[in-house]
């Protein structure tokens, strides 16, 4: 999806690099490029940031011997990270029951976010939104014997939602609230 905007578009590359500095960490949640390994290599040389790739179904270039993996710190299908004391579950495909989903901080705020792509802005995304609301409206009894709602913080990081602009976790959370 990034490649759809960036390939052949100096403005997209300039805008992106205007926000992303050399040492910023950038996690791409799949479908980086529909191009060949050579085309993807060329694109990657022009992007700022320390890059990490969660592989998507269109990232076929990764399996090509001509692809230079050195531009990435790591390439994985799934990862769990920490960002400001929050757990972040990353996968190209949405995971409806993700690790850490029930974890809350001292104030009762969810501590875990599941970031995904793949479904774009499709009927599948509408179904996921319905699932999220059903889950949030479902009550359960916590360890203290109190009734609580089930947290469900799945965020679709579809690049068109952010106008192809790289966003921080806080920015994705805020954008997701407004959608």
PLM regions with names:
Residues 7, 28, 115:
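Conserved Rossmann-like nucleotide-binding pocket used by diverse enzymes
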Residues 21-35, 52-60, 156-159:
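Active-site neighborhood of divalent metal-dependent phosphoester/pyrophosphate hydrolases
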């Amino acid at each position: 999806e990034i490649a759809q905007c960036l390939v052949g578009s100096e403005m997209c590359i300039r805008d992106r690099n205007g926000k992303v500095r050399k040492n910023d960490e950038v996690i791409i949640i799949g479908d980086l490029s529909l191009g060949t390994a050579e085309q993807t290599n060329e694109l990657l040389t022009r992007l700022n940031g320390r890059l990490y790739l969660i592989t998507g179904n269109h990232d076929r270039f990764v399996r090509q011997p001509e692809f230079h993996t050195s531009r990435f710190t790591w390439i994985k299908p799934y990862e769990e990270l920490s960002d400001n004391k929050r757990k972040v579950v990353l996968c190209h495909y949405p995971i409806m029951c993700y690790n850490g989903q029930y974890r809350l901080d001292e104030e009762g705020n969810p501590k875990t976010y599941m970031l995904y792509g793949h479904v774009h802005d499709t009927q599948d995304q509408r179904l996921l939104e319905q699932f999220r609301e059903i889950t949030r409206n479902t009550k359960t009894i916590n360890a203290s014997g109190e009734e609580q709602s089930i947290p469900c913080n799945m965020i679709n990081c579809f690049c068109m939602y952010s106008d192809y602009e790289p966003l921080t976790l806080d920015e994705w959370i805020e954008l997701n609230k407004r959608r």
